[in-house]
Amino acid sequence: MREYICEQICTEYNFNQKPMEFNEYQKLARKTAIYAGAGKNFVYPALGLCGESGEVAEKIKKIVRDSNNIVDGKCRAELEKELGDVLWYIANLAAELDLDMESIARRNIEKLADRQERGVLHGSGDNR
């Protein structure tokens, strides 16, 4: 069953032929969203996002502690997996909130560009 689902998703999206866009990723991530109340449960992906973000932080902490801030190939591969999990939870949380990833990404860059133009990238506060 697992192999069939993977084959179905991989067939739908030809990973070797084109770069993946945010909304395409979100659509494919939704196909793997198997949790209680999927489609009307924003709590699960929100908590998952916190957990996976913590795993990224934990790996970074160990790189600082054990490897003198040097990220080798093994650490990079582990971080890539964890960052992928973070991305999955972001995509599914956004979908639960009826938001699309392309719009989120675009609005975020617009916000940051505006802050940069006004010289307020540094500082604190959501509405600077």
Model segments located where?
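Flexible "arm" and connector segments at domain edges
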Residues: 2-83, 87-128
